[in-house]
Amino acid sequence: MTEQAPTSSQAPAPTERKRARPGERREQILQALAAMLEQPGAERITTAALASRLGVSEAALYRHFASKAQMFEALIDFIEQAVFTRMAQILESGSPEGVPPEEGARQAHRVVALVLQFGERNPGLVRVMVGDALVLEHERLQARMNQFFDRIESSLRQCLRPAAGAAGSATPSVDAQVAASVLTAFLQGRLQRFARSGLRRLPTEHLEASLALML
C-alpha cells in the first residue's frame, strides 16, 4: 500500500519510529546471530553482545526467544529446511522405474555439493553445523546436528546402492553404506576445515576432482 505525499498546503506528519512487523524482529535476531558467528571468538557469543549489536535490550530478545538455545534451534530449523528441501528435489529427480547406477552416483555428487555450497554461502551457520557454536549449549542441539548428518548419510546410501548392486557386489547394502559413510565424513571434514581455518579454506575447493576419486 502506498501513501499520497503531502501537498504544499499540508504540513508533513511527524516522523515516527518504524516498528518491526510481526516476525521481522525475530528474523533480525537470527540474522544478527548468524553474522556474529562469522567472527573470531564466535563460540562465546552472549545474549548481551547480541542485544548490543541489534541496539535493543536483552529483555527484547527474550520477548521472541525463551533462551539462546531456542535461537540456535531456530537456526538449525533453517539449516534443515534449506538443505532437506533441496535434497528431496535431487532424490526425486530419478526415474520412476528406479534409479540407474550412474544416476545414483550423480545424485550423491549433487547432495554432497549441495551441503558444501550451502555452508560456503552461510559461513556463520557452518559453526553451528560442525558444533563449534554449540559446545556450551544444551546437548539436544548437538544431537539434532548429529541427526542432520545421519539423514544425509542415509540419503547417500540410498543413492549409491544401485551402483553397488550393478557392480556385482555380494553385499551391495554394506558397500553402499561404506561409500555413504566416506562421503559424509568428507563433507563434514570440509565444513570443519572451513570453520577451523577462520573461513578461509572454502568447502568446495577442488570439489569436482575430490568427488571423482570417490564416485
Predicted segments with their positions:
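Basic, helix-initiating cap at the start of DNA-binding domains
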Residues: M1-R53, Q70-E73, V99
